[in-house]
Swiss-Prot record:
GO biological process, one term: methionyl-tRNA aminoacylation
Protein name stated in the entry: Methionine--tRNA ligase
EC number: 6.1.1.10
Gene behind the chain: metG
GO molecular function, one term: methionine-tRNA ligase activity
Amino acid sequence: MRKILVTNALPYANGPIHMGHLLGYIQADIWVRAMRAMGHDVTYVCADDAHGTAIMLRAEANGISPEKQIANVQQEHIRDFDGFGVHFDHYDSTHSAENKVRSEDIYLKNREAGNIAVRPITQLFDPEKQMFLSDRFIKGTCPKCKAEDQYGDACEVCGTTYNATELLNPRSTLSGATPVEKSSDHYFFKLPNFGEYLQKWTRDEGRLPVSIANKLDEWFEAGLADWDISRDAPYFGFEIPDAPNKYFYVWVDAPIGYMSSFENYIKAKRPELNFDDYWKKDSQNEVYHFIGKDIVYFHALFWPAMLEGANYRTPSGLFVNGFLTVNGQKMSKSRGTFIKAETYLQHLNPEYLRYYFASKLSDKVEDSDLNLDDFVQKVNSDLVGKVVNIASRCAKFINSSFNNTLSANCAEPELVQSFIDAGDSIAQAYEAREFSAAIREIMALADKANQYIDEKKPWALAKQEGQEQQVHNVCSVGINLFRQLAIYLSPVLPTLAAQVQAFLQLESFDFASRQQILLAHEIAQFQPLMQRVDPKAVAAMVDASKDSLAATAEAPKAEKKKEKKVEKKPEPKVGEAEIIGIEDFIKVDLRVALVQEAATVEGSDKLLQLTLDVGEAEPRNVFSGIREFYQPEDLKGKLVVMVANLAPRKMRFGISNGMVLAAGNGDGVWVISPDSGAKPGDKVS
């Protein structure tokens, strides 16, 4: 029996759980249930990520303390997770005494080991709010392309990265005030100290998906930098030891919350467990983190480095999921597809969504699409039309004609045994997180069971004199096949599994219990197990999501100081731009590129991520600020012109290796495309 600790990425205590969040939590819960069904000792913990400026400001806007803010949100999160059957053994908060102690311990051990540096940095300071501003609370004009309304770290139009102090016409998004530069001592974690260690760690077998390890190579090639782990007061979080008015950056104590949540679980519920058995350096137990692909950088670089520096064990593996789209597009409040967990639960059975997600998920880091029409069709066809239908077709005969008791003989031992044997490959698929493969195999078995019943036609046999035993045998085989399917689906559909277990009056419903065929076994009266998805309920859920947005928009808002208006600079007219010589122009290497792939960028309303064939051995990754004007599918297969010798730019979404040329006049943007006949890699001159 393996001993395993599983965690999920911590939801931020600043808002509700929505469909995009649930993809990763349902994936982890299914895996935990499957591993337990195979007989392993699995502990599953999580917590709210409860620190940071955003929470402090949200509490201020709501007129409550940060402590009250995070307590309220935590109860909402617990309610929503419970509603979807995501059953944590313990759900904590990073704002706990245990997390404070553990965070200080890891920091002090790293400080003692020489992994902490202190040096002054110059930041932008809001004179009205009397606080330093992080990049997300600063907007201004890009110093490179002069695009307005850009954040303090990178331009989403031209892709340039910069320091917030380089922004033109900067303004605080909190007060509208013009920030001033101010110096402050900050604390840094020396990540470069762990460069060689991390390069090996990220390539350890089973540690990371290969695609993620390949992506991290870009960071190693660019060179790791010291990580700023401090924030200045005012800030809601833990104060750094021996550093008054300096606080741990939220991404320091957030992953440490995995440890403190487990620690609190031991104290509250399982004192027989030992914390060190899971977290000491030489621990043989397993620790896995289920996370979204947007937070890989923190979990695959900073987190293992901090643990290594403090002499703790590192995670056995990171299981990474992609993003969720709805109907093929980014979730949208205006379209009603930005669906909160609470809204879904008011309209639909949560097990519908668990099944649909499972049918889509694999061990690959791929985005998943919740197509609402396909959702209705798949659930109704698979769960109601195939699986539940087997019990419905057979149980009525057992209940009405055979005193609720199955036949003492198995009429189809080879057929039933084939279902039992299939459990091995299904279990392997679950363990490998190949849920879609497991579902496909289970549904193939369901088809086989229905085919058997269709061929034997117990309803017709029941009308023939002297065929009672045959009816009894056929329906008993059908119930045994149904039981196997329900066991295999139990990690995905725990509520349905509990109902089936009660209906079949079984003490155990784990994978091992499937080996025993039910003979002369008494069952309960059959009750309907699952209703069909009503398309009207889906439509009502979408409408309610629109309604909740409208209600939010119309709700009274806290008064804010009017932002200072920044005058928009007109684009220079033809002939007014700075004159350059031919020696400057010929430095620019313009090449024809073919768009192989195009995708939206999570967290950006302006960027598209393009994979470009430039006639080189490997394709180029380029971020382009054209999302408002092009759909990804419009660009795939299109020839464009790019600047091929632009220095790589590290952005918060990844590294951009070039710039796609486009024309614009304020009313739109048009990507420049060569005539047909041009080939990827051709030089433009």
